[in-house]
């Protein structure tokens, strides 16, 4: 025989409520979770402890209808921030662009003002787009995890693949520094090889 979920009293067959405590026979279903709330919950799992910061930035971007916003961490850490947040393709692209530009400067003896202007433009491009790129990366990663992970492991996998990776940040920052060091010597190497 069935018992009340709240007080444990035996229920009569077909009873809608418990005779002892008066609660409905079945507990009320949990309120439905909106797709938007579930999406934000998964973004919070992916981003980690800094989620409130990014949620505010993304909400402001959405409210203002803008695709760009300022990211101080990206401004100061540049390629290191891209690596820390897992934006590896963008980090490699930025390193390659900076490498080519630095090498071209050496070959053509470009004035330092041009070099400085290029550095400012590249830095602003990364800094202003970092929040948008990170959200796109998070959403793409979450979708890929949902498509491939076993149903009971999705949340754990989202949390594992998200967050920050300081080793990747340091590694990409060092790769960037080494690439610029190498690019600085390309003109000298070319002159020696002639």
Residue spans for each PLM region:
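Cys/His-rich metal-coordination motifs, chiefly Zn-binding "fingers/knuckles"
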Residues: 1-31
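Membrane interfacial helix-start motif at the N-side
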Residues: 53-90
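Short hydrophobic/aromatic segments of transmembrane alpha-helices and their interfaces
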Residues: 1, 71-74, 116-117
